[in-house]
Regions:
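Short beta-strand/loop motif that positions the catalytic acidic residue
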Residues: 195, 201-203
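Flexible "cap/lid" loop of the alpha/beta hydrolase fold
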Residues: 100-105, 110-140
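Catalytic active-site module of serine/aspartate enzymes centered on a nucleophile-bearing elbow/loop
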Residues: 225-257
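Acidic catalytic loop of the alpha/beta-hydrolase fold
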Residues: 206-210
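Conserved alpha/beta-hydrolase catalytic His-Asp/Glu region
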Residues: 124-125, 140-194
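Conserved HGGG/HGGXW glycine-rich cap/lid loop of the alpha/beta-hydrolase fold
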Residues: 9-61
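Active-site loop/oxyanion-hole signature of alpha/beta-hydrolase fold enzymes
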Residues: 40-43, 49-94, 247
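Alpha/beta-hydrolase fold catalytic core
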Residues: 1-22, 44-47, 85, 186, ...
């Protein structure tokens, strides 16, 4: 356990293992603890970095702070603090905005990008229209509650569902970002067409937040991007089927060598 005084905050992070770095960026339903099924697997060959985004876990967001609009610069500052020049990025949901935004601004620092259950920070007309159509069909306000994982998890593994909810409950109340997203951290249509960073999208076939057809479409916007769909999983493949998730990510990273 360690702390980094960076970017106006005191960021909590952990580092496990040695070798090439993999940074894991959690989603809105988690924090650094979310990756408990990934770190023991990947630390045998890689240096695994987990952290709490500002406003999550043990990283406090200053009053009136920029919130999510600072996530990508926070990541850059953390890497600088750790002396990591290039890294693999594994992003879950909200963490996709962090990592896609970081890659859009500093592609030379990314060995490979995994976008799990997310397409955040990507801006393209077809993607936007698909997401709008999805939200227009929803009859209730959009929330993470009850949608973070597939109902089948609570039926078959109530212990795992309870653990997920308990990890999420450790986070303080969320704050809304202030200001506008820096355009440097937006993967525009033009940037996506020229994308050179190896990229993998992973989707749960039961995800109702970012359904697999939308993520598969997102993968077509990046030259050479890969797409994997995992059965019987909702919005948290890394948690619901860690064995499949770890295997898919491990094969992708090995292929980037």
């Amino acid at each position: 356990m360690a702390w980094a005084e960076i970017n106006g905050i005191r960021m909590f992070y952990e580092s496990h293992g040695e070798g090439e770095a993999i940074v894991f960026a959690h989603g809105a339903g988690g924090n650094h603890l979310s990756w408990w099924q990934q770190v023991p697997f990947f630390r045998e060959k890689y240096r695994c970095i987990t952290f709490d985004h500002r406003g999550f876990g043990q990283t406090v967001e200053p009053e009136g702070g920029p919130g999510a609009n600072a996530f990508s610069t926070d990541l850059a500052a953390l890497l600088d603090h750790l002396g990591i020049e290039r890294t693999f990025l594994v992003a879950q949901s909200m963490g996709g905005g962090t990592c896609m935004g970081f890659t859009a601004a500093w592609p030379e620092r990314v060995r490979g990008l995994v976008m799990a259950d997310t397409m955040l920070a990507m801006e393209e007309d077809g993607l936007a229209s698909r997401m709008k159509a999805l939200r227009d069909k929803q009859t209730q306000p959009f929330t993470l509650q009850g949608r973070a994982y597939a109902p089948i998890l609570k039926e078959k593994r109530p212990d795992m569902a309870f653990l997920y909810d308990s990890v999420m409950a450790l986070n303080p109340p969320r704050t809304q970002p202030t200001g506008d997203r820096d355009p440097r951290f937006v993967a525009t249509t033009e940037k996506l067409a020229k994308w050179t960073v190896p990229t993998l999208f992973i989707a749960g076939d039961l995800d109702v937040i970012f359904p697999p057809d939308i993520l598969e479409y997102a993968s077509t916007l990046i030259p050479g991007a890969q797409f994997a769909k995992v059965p019987d999983c909702g919005h948290s493949v890394y948690f619901e089927d860690a064995e499949a998730f770890n295997r898919i990510v491990n094969e992708f990273i090995a292929g980037c060598a």
